[in-house]
Amino acid sequence: DAVEFPEDGYHGDDIRELAQLFYNKEGDKYLDCDEKTRHDALAQFGLSHNIPKMKADLERYGIHYDEWFFESSLHESGYVADTVAALTAQGYTYEKDGALWLKTAEILAKNLRAAGKSDADIEKLALKDDVLRRANGFYTYFAADIAYHRNKFAVRGFDKVINIWGADHHGHVARLKGAMDALGLD
């Protein structure tokens, strides 16, 4: 509880449990390490703990994947950075406070107007922009998710995608669709 969650980070209760398990195993070993080393160790621990649970949950619903696609491959290949660069080239990003932001409010407002919503109705939604790259240089989960979906459509050639969303992703869908629109992908 002494560590604050990043504003744009995952805030589910299970993250506290995972952090405690990591601390029980590793202790203070990573306290004095650089942020990347600490991040990589936590990510690897989280994957080894959570992927088997996710597979078991999906199995209960009869869902089986032939291949698991890891977010880390998008970062390692530079595809997240490439996707953010594509959004920037289209004029959909700006820098503020050392971070790179997606013009989410502008994109969603444009889509809502095209769907027949009035400016007054759109104003009531209090749409906000999203951080793609934090001031510390790390890309956000949202940036990686945009890259992942771009990869599905633009690289792997999917024409239909079925997403299984967690209950905490209800606001994510329209924002992700907006990012796909900004990239010229449906």
Describe each PLM feature range.
Residues 1-186:
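NTP-dependent nucleotidyl-transfer catalytic core
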